Amino acid sequence: MSVEKWGLFEVELKGPAEGNPFVDVQLSAEFKNGDTTIKAPGFYDGDGTYKIRFMPSVEGEWSYKTQSNADALDGQMGSFECGTPSAANHGPVRVRNQHHFGYEDGTSYFSFGTTCYAWVHQGDTLEEQTLKTLETAGFNKLRMCIFPKDYIFNKNEPAYYPFEKQGAGWDFSRYDIAFFQHLEKRVAQLGALGIEADIILFHPYDRWGYAKMQHEEDYAYLRYVVARLAAYRHVWWSLANEYDFMLKDKPMEVWDHFFEIVQENDPYDHLRSIHNGNVTMNYDHTKPGVTHVCVQNWDVKRMREWRAAYGKPVIDDECEYEGNILRNWGNITARELVHRYWICIVYGGYAGHGETYEHPEDILWWSKGGVLVGESWPRLKFLRGLVEEGPAEGIEPFAGSFPWGRTAGGGRGNYRLIYFGEHQPKRFGNGLPEEGRYEADVIDTWEMTVETLGTFEGQEPIELPGRPGLALRIRPVEG
C-alpha cells in the first residue's frame, strides 16, 4: 500500500466488543522509518473495529507495530510505502518567522478564515451547500465546533449527537460512532478544498450537558477526538470558543491541562489556540502549549500590541461580523469588516470573517453555513490575492506611533503596504524606501482595483486620489 507524504494511513483491526471498549481498551502503534519513530494513538470505531491513523512526514518505507492491553490487538505488524506529496499537498501549517505561518514544505500560508460554528449539525442538504459555497469564496480556514450549538438562531436539533443516550441523558463514556464518522467526513471534505479545519473542542452554548461534563470525561473526550482527527494534516485545535464563559465549571488550571492533553496525544504537533469572549479576558497566550494567539476584539488597531505582548502569530478571529442582527457583534457593515481586516493584515496579523444577516429560517452563515449573501467576502478574497503576491515571509508592521498608530503601515525589505482606511490624504510620503527605485500602486479596497501610479525614487510624497478606503503598495524595481 502507498500513501503520499502528509497523507492519511489507517490501520484497521478487529478486537473486543464487549464491555465498554472506549474505556477498557488501550491501543497505539509505533511507526518507524529509519531513525524516525512516531507513536500514534488508536481509537474504537464501533462493532469490534479499532483504528489507528497516521500521517507520515518522511518518504520511504514505514513499518508499524501495535501495543494494546487486548491480546487481539497487541503486536500486530505491517508496513506501507510513503510517496511524494501531490501538487496541492503542502503538509500541515506551522508557525513561521515568529508572527506568521507557513506550510511544512516551505510554501507560504496566510490565514484568511471564516466562521461556520455549527455547520456539521445541519443535515446533508445544507452542509453540501456550505461546501459548494466554500469552493469559490476564497477562505483557507474555517472555524467550526464539534459539539452542537444552543444559541440565538440555533434552536434546531442536530442530525447526530456525540455521545450515546442513557435514559433521559447521555453516557459520556460512550461516543456515538455515526456522529464522529460524519464529522470526519466533513473535515476531510474541507481538506480537499484546501481549507484548514480550525476545530473548536469546547464552547458554552449548550442545552445537552456537553459544556458541563466532569473533568475526567472532558479529558477522555479530548484523547478520543485527537486520536480520530490528528492524522488529518489540515486540522488545527481551538481549545474553546469563549473559554472565559465556562470558567465556573472549567477553571483556568483545567484549561491549562486541556492544552497538555492535546499536546501529549497529538504526535504531529498541530497548531493550538484558545478564544476569549470578554475582550478583557485574553488567555495567557505566552504559555508554551499555545502556538498562536486567537482573540475576539473589535479594536483591531491593537494588533501591534498583541504581537508584542505574546510574541506569536495573532488572529483576531472575531473582530465582529458583517450583518444586521440585534447584537452589536453581528451588525457591522461589509465596509467596516473589510476595513478591520485590512488593518489586521497590514499590522502583521490576521483576522476572521463571519456573516450574520437575518434569515426567515435562521440560516446564518456564521453558524449554519449555506450561502454567503454579504459584500465583504469577495473583497477579502481580493485582499488575500494581494497578500499572496507580497513577501512570502509575511508583513511586519512599522514601529512608532506617528503616523502608524492611525495609518496602518507595514512591509518587508523595500516592499510596503500602507492602508489609509478612514483617512484620505492627497499626498503621502511616510514609510517610503530611502534608496532604490520602486513602483507605486494605489489600491481601492472596496472597488477591488489596482492602479499603477508610476516609478519613483526617494521619499518625496506621492500624489493620491484623496478618498477613503485606499491603500498604497510599494514594490522595488529590479535593475
Spans of features found by a protein language model:
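Short, flexible/disordered intra-domain loops and linkers
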Residues: 211, 247-253, 325-334, 367-368
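Extended acidic/polar, glycine-enriched regions
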Residues: 30, 38-98
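Non-catalytic, glycine-rich low-complexity segments
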Residues: 1-35, 40-43, 79-85, 402-409
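Short beta-strand segments within Ig-like beta-sandwich modules, predominantly Fibronectin type-III
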Residues: 42-44, 453-456
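Active-site mouth of glycoside hydrolases
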Residues: 90-302
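Catalytic-core region of carbohydrate-active enzymes that cleave or remodel glycosidic bonds
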Residues: 286-361
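Mature catalytic domains of secreted/periplasmic carbohydrate-active enzymes
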Residues: 56, 73-76, 82-85, 285, ...
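Aromatic- and carboxylate-lined catalytic core of secreted/periplasmic carbohydrate-active enzymes
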Residues: 2, 20-21, 323-324, 337-454, ...
